[in-house]
Amino acid sequence: MTQTIQTQTGKNSGAGRTYEVRTFGCQMNVHDSERLSGLLEDSGYVPASEGVTPDVVVFNTCAVRENADKRLYGTLGQMKAIKDEHPGMQIAVGGCMAQKDKQTVVDKAPWVDVVFGTHNLGSLPTLLERSAHNHKAEVEIFDALEEFPSVLPAKRESAYAGWVSVSVGCNNTCTFCIVPSLRGKEQDRRPGEILAEVKALVEQGVSEVTLLGQNVNAYGVNFADETLERDRTAFSKLLRACGEIEGLERLRFTSPHPAEFTDDVIDAMAETPAVCPQLHMPLQSGSDKVLKDMKRSYRSKKFLAILDKVRERIPHAAITTDIIVGFPGETEEDFQATLDVVEKARFSSAFTFQYSPRPGTPAAEMENQVPKAVVQDRYERLLALQERISEEENRKLIGTTQELLVQADGRKNDRTQRRSGRSRDGRLVHFTPEGDVRAGDVVEVVITDAAPHFLIADGGVASHRRTRAGDMTELGETPTTAPVGVGLGMPSIKKPEPTTAGGCSTGGCGCE
């Protein structure tokens, strides 16, 4: 949309100015925000203290959720008064909504200083500097990826758990989804660079890593070297290779696509001790007709067959899902098919959404949009069914011993003084702590009660292992990962070479 930036931002262009990044949306946005924070601090900005108005506010936005535009512009409206009271304050808007709306952001909110998209995260410091110098808004949206996010520095949010992108973009054409048009076609990182980033995090105390992509099990479809043939076993190889990294205790991934989910991935999950017994597998609908209209290239029978295979190899796996209610043309019969699949699948939990038209998607133009009242009724019925199943599945764990990675989200309430942690299968557990239990430490507890969305362990702590991540949390420190260069092709997967203190591989370079 605009010319490529020619000037280079000075290393200390932030000159001690404070910043805050506010994130809306998915895990991909959360990870992108870590990159934005790393970029700003690399340019001299410092995080704003709690309760202090920052000099720069960056909104990393979502265009998928219902009313995402109203939420953004409503928030920007509130920011105008704050900016009027703080001369020199800058507001930047990035992410999927910025990629979609472009100049419209400034037209609707003229007090915004910078608009940047999903393909040019690295432009943010320069755009802030240029806007301040020129005293006008800078809007820069690229139609294709400028640089892989892995070449940007990152300031991690957590001392004990980290995101690592395996790819960006998506090659699917789901009729309800706007993500491919905003993030582009899938592009995959070299496995050697993924392993180097995982190893760098582990060396700084991180014990849990989640591999992240719009469709992680399609990994290997589009490396930078287009002459290389696709390797359909690339993701399972990556899981096994990550599992060989010493010190990595928990490995997760999100999200796979049922059409691409193969037996070699199930085998890698079952045979790699670090891989957690958890699978998030989006269903979207249990109706084959609706799945066809959604352009989801699988049917309910195949979906359930995958779950059977996973449970055969990993009997105690916790399986979660995404479901959309009220897709255009969905009949009561279609919805009943979804309820039937949910009953058979026995998900430990489900993220359920009421369909909302997203401008620019084929589904938004479809006939037979389902009335809002009907969608609400079906949503409540689905929710009630899944709540029952979730509680039934959780109650099966009463009396079992669970290993928890303690979380940093404080105590559950003042009366019980419970802390929270995640079991290896991803379930949330509220437990009664004993002694100096820190976020990032590992405890074992016995489950004493259950509810649909969490487990309770009020019998004390059976064991407590202090960790380096706990030490980092106590010091108020989080890992940082330095830029990883862009490389070509897909080398054979092996354990990563030793990394420098900054987290870069000593000899490799890769793509994200």
Swiss-Prot record:
It catalyses: N(6)-dimethylallyladenosine(37) in tRNA + (sulfur carrier)-SH + AH2 + 2 S-adenosyl-L-methionine = 2-methylsulfanyl-N(6)-dimethylallyladenosine(37) in tRNA + (sulfur carrier)-H + 5'-deoxyadenosine + L-methionine + A + S-adenosyl-L-homocysteine + 2 H(+). Keywords: 4Fe-4S, Cytoplasm, Iron, Iron-sulfur, Metal-binding, S-adenosyl-L-methionine, Transferase, tRNA processing. It is an enzyme of class 2 (transferase). CDD domains: Radical_SAM. Its EC number is 2.8.4.3. Binds 2 [4Fe-4S] clusters. One cluster is coordinated with 3 cysteines and an exchangeable S-adenosyl-L-methionine. It is found in: Cytoplasm. Residues 156-392 form the Radical SAM core domain. GO terms for molecular function: 4 iron, 4 sulfur cluster binding; metal ion binding; N6-isopentenyladenosine methylthiotransferase activity. Residues 395-461 form the TRAM domain. GO terms for cellular component: cytosol. Residues 17-133 form the MTTase N-terminal domain. Residues 473-512 are annotated as: Disordered. Belongs to the methylthiotransferase family. MiaB subfamily. Catalyzes the methylthiolation of N6-(dimethylallyl)adenosine (i(6)A), leading to the formation of 2-methylthio-N6-(dimethylallyl)adenosine (ms(2)i(6)A) at position 37 in tRNAs that read codons beginning with uridine. Monomer. This is tRNA-2-methylthio-N(6)-dimethylallyladenosine synthase. It comes from Corynebacterium jeikeium (strain K411). The gene is miaB.
